[in-house]
Amino acid sequence: MSQITIQTPRGVSISGTFTRPVDSHDAAVIFSHTFLSDRHASGMFDSLGRALRRAGYATLAFDFSGHGESGDEIITFDPLIEDFRAASGWLADQGFARQICVGHEFGATVALRANPPSVQTYVLVSPVLGPLSYDWDLVFSDVQLSDLERHGTTTVPDDTESVRRHFTINKGTLADMSMVSSEKVLRGVSVPVLITHDAFDEETGLLDRTRDAFPLLPDGSVLDMTAPPVGIAVEY
């Protein structure tokens, strides 16, 4: 296991963990976490990573900029798309030109929009593939909403075990979260995509957005309703 630092074209450093099993294949898995999370995805990526390495895959899990141990950034799609391309490029430079992306929620959206040439398939958990409606008054405090209105930015406490104390968002973050365009997300994606949703996604509308977008996905793509394997569910 190696702790690595990758420089993005705009000069922001992103921090990650790269692990190559002794009996690894020539393919690697790159993880893409959601907004306001980190490379561990509350333990989900750690559990999946161990299972994938037992199967012979090298893994790269990294913190997007503005998250975890990576450099500071206001959290919107554009810089995170650049981060993902930089991470995929780093993996390719290590000899892993065949990559599988495992993406979660908005991390899946970012990875699809990045669409680097080395990613040959996507496995997406609860991806956001269309617009969603939020009541921001229930999501943010009065102080945060006032900061957004007056200053254009606000902070959100990071309550994970990360070294980061808070995330920084702006009005663009809210627009990115609520105004996802399936056409924009899937434009240019030409490799098969496996999508998994659970019952909670059906309640929140994520499943409906995926069903709406599914005709835009490449041939061979699959949508599956699933629950996490018992071992992963316990650890997650």
Q: How should these model regions be labeled?
A:
Residues 49-69:
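Conserved alpha/beta-hydrolase
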